[in-house]
Amino acid sequence: MWRFSGRRGLCAVQRLSCGRVHHRVWREKSDQACERALQYKVGEKIHGFTVNQVTPVPELFLTAVKLSHDNTGARYLHLAREDKNNLFSVQFRTTPMDSTGVPHVLEHTVLCGSQKYPCRDPFFKMLNRSLSTFMNAMTASDYTIYPFSTQNPKDFQNLLSVYLDATFFPCLRELDFWQEGWRLEHENPRDPQTPLIFKGVVFNEMKGAFTDNERIFSQHLQNKLLPDHTYSVVSGGDPLCIPELTWEQLKQFHATHYHPSNARFFTYGNFQLEGHLKQIHEEALSKFQRLEQSTAVPAQPHWDKPREFHITCGPDSLATETAKQTTVSVSFLLPDITDTFEAFTLSLLSSLLIAGPNSPFYKALIESGLGTDFSPDVGYNGYTREAYFSVGLQGIAEKDVKTVRELVDRTIEEVIEKGFEDDRIEALLHKIEIQTKHQSASFGLTLTSYIASCWNHDGDPVELLQIGSQLTRFRKCLKENPKFLQEKVEQYFKNNQHKLTLSMKPDDKYYEKQTQMETEKLEQKVNSLSPADKQQIYEKGLELQTQQSKHQDASCLPALKVSDIEPSMPFTKLDIGLAAGDIPVQYCPQPTNGMVYFRAFSSLNTLPEDLRPIVPLFCSVLTKLGCGILNYREQAQQIELKTGGMSVTPHVLPDDSQLDTYEQGVLFSSLCLERNLPDMMHLWSEIFNNPCFEEEEHFKVLVKMTAQELSNGISDSGHLYAALRASKTLTPSGDLQETFSGMDQVKVMKRIAEMTDIKPILRKLPRIKKYLLNCDNMRCSVNATPQQMPQAEKEVENFLRNVGRSKKERKPVRPHIVEKPTPSGPSGAAHVSGSQIVRKLVTDPTFKPCQMKTHFVLPFPVNYIGECVRTVPYADPDHASLKILARLMTAKFLHTEIREKGGAYGGGAKLTHSGIFTLYSYRDPNSIETLQSFGKAVDWAKSGKFTQQDIDEAKLSVFSTVDSPVAPSDKGMDHFLYGLSDEMKQAYREQLFAVNHDKLTSVSHKYLGIGKSTHGLAILGPENSKIAKDPSWIIK
């Protein structure tokens, strides 16, 4: 996977009762792993490693142990933390000097077989032989990293063995290079009369990646700001350069870069460090000697004057104004990221400059009305050896490029003169406090990503993690010098000659030109071939296809057994109280580390149909337009000072027992430090009772940003949009999902953003408020420590009494409403005490599914495809069989057909909670052929040509998802949102265990390929003459 983006924050944080609730005592979190790690002594020798440093990091509840390998110099960092989701990663500094994508192709190819595990594609096979909670590999601009995580010690050893052998002793077979990188092959490999074309997984992945104009801009920005070494090239590979890469170059790059002397090992969690060190030393490092490295990235020579560049990109067919599609940014080179305090300071400074409506650049650029949103890669980017800061606008007219540049310069001058308000600095420091306290389910992955760039350039990763000391030093600098930040702005922005202005505008013939250049490259390659070369290519193509079609013996790979899966799941204690009379509130006591997580769900049942399409917009702007006596700037300031964020999102929640029944509503979510709970709940009261809908100009700004974000997201999430569209006519909930989140919503927002007079839309917001922001059909939930629960009860009670109810009873718009209580009592939900939550579901007894085939013609060189089938709801025993079948079809058929043979970046099958079975592909050079592969996959499933071993592997893969760790903030959410008790989930678990060969073939025949009315199809991608001629397709 190619990764290209700026460094994110440490732990991105997006996000009196009738029956008195009885809270249970919660055992304090054990610090056993941290205490154990503190016993290590500096200089101690352990399995070929020497301990160099042992440092407690109390703010993150961990102990850091730094080691080095005696023979090879390999670096090692272990973060001991009482977290059972343990993680390993190995990282290599990879510094390509051309755009052939050699580190990216190598990342793919090393995972295709190794000395100890010579079977083809052990990486994908291990996805089905493990209970991993994460497995992947990523290529960044200057490093390649291979992480995995699991909660099972035996699984950790298995995966570690496979990862070590793959990275240090890969086979690197030529056929694997052909498959994963690039190859010349006949369009139909079995017919030498068909034309030769370029194929390959990475080749197609990068063609897809560069359909994203934001990515094109970000890539050029880095290449042109840092032009003198490795950052001047495309590490993932330029599709026009990838065909220059040879197999020999690939092997040479591995020999020079994938060596322990150039490696950084990282482990995290509560497993014993000694076991990791022993295995890594014995299976890999003991077989190497130290190698002098030559991979260091030199400092970029600084310019003596600013530079300007202009580039082109593809047209955006969903842009709100065709005359305003230009992007411009001004970027500044900053110091080395290994100066951790300077990097910390500049990262904070970047947030002060660009984050939220109170920031100087938001006021100067976003609110100027010149564009739709900030330019890509805005803010501080710490992924390269020297960081950079970038700011600008997208969606502007070409004539306004100079104006934007002048606004940037003027804003810098104003900041130097006026500085920042104390409240804004405090709000930012408060955000960091929340980020260090909030616990994610994949904290190890967050940490390895956070330290990767700094450590890659020999910075101190432990220093980077010591947020507390960085904050103390930052406060000290501010106290000693009130102009500390202004001087940084003057130093790094005003007086910095290493400054780049980059502008980009669409060219209607951009993709045509790209295709032409690819055609010329192809002709050049083909014309240089002798008849013997062509014959060899034909034979190699047949050989590759034979290899891909051959049954693979994976017996050499380690594997867990189904018996290694825990037979039962841990149950979560929940208490349901009634507040303000009869409003259910779910209390879930958890070790939340001093944080409180509040959620409220409000029904949309009474909302008139004409308002439904703009519910997502209402949700998006509700917390951004002001409330009560606060204008939108003051509201943003209070949200930042008192909470970790307040979000509002539309939700369509399918019923667990009826396909045509669902719950519709809006989820309000927020989090805060315990001390700020009264302030957070007061903010919610003001948002519910007194939201402001008068700020027309700011509303326009928010509409344009929302429309731009939706348009920009299509190239990254095209398969999700295709699946939503394909399921639109299969269930009533699918239709509403498409309205809220699919291409229908993208089109709605495009239309609204194009309106010259936006008042008619603004006037609809108070109407939605009237139906939604009341207690009529609401339920709430709180996740907090047991000690905090009495205070939380009191605050939620006050909130609900303040919000009140509608003055008159409103009837549901859709007449068929079913009241469904959540399970309770010893038989239904023994771990839930107190009252019940009663959900009001919409049902449509007259609904008839029908087939719809839609092709969204977009200017992309690749396709995103979804085929959906209506099956059964969650509680039906067949759902578990279909869940296993989806994984089985992905691993044993679709992966080979769509990725290996077809060259798509991804593809497979999945089953949603709502009973929609989806076949999909991602960044796919094919369309009709892929739909045919979907049909063959169904035939394969019906034939039952799979073994008990295949079924067991599919179960392991499904359980790795079912048992993935849940953060304390999210415990009990399945019960709160979907009405699923732990007993119901345990019953489903037992159904998964009980799936067998007969059940799998039975559900294949029963649901897949049985009739058009239960099928939907959608494709996002380029024009297609075959589809255009087929009247059964709707062309958009």
From Swiss-Prot:
Keyword tags: Acetylation, Disulfide bond, Hydrolase, Metal-binding, Metalloprotease, Mitochondrion, Protease, Transit peptide, Zinc
Result, substituting T546K: In strain: LG/J and SM/J
Subcellular location: Mitochondrion matrix
Cofactor binding note of this UniProt entry: Binds 1 zinc ion per subunit.
One GO CC term on file: mitochondrion
Transit peptide extent on chain: 1-15
Class of the enzyme per the UniProt entry, highest EC level: hydrolase
EC number: 3.4.24.-
UniProt name for this protein: Presequence protease, mitochondrial
Organism in which the protein naturally occurs: Mus musculus
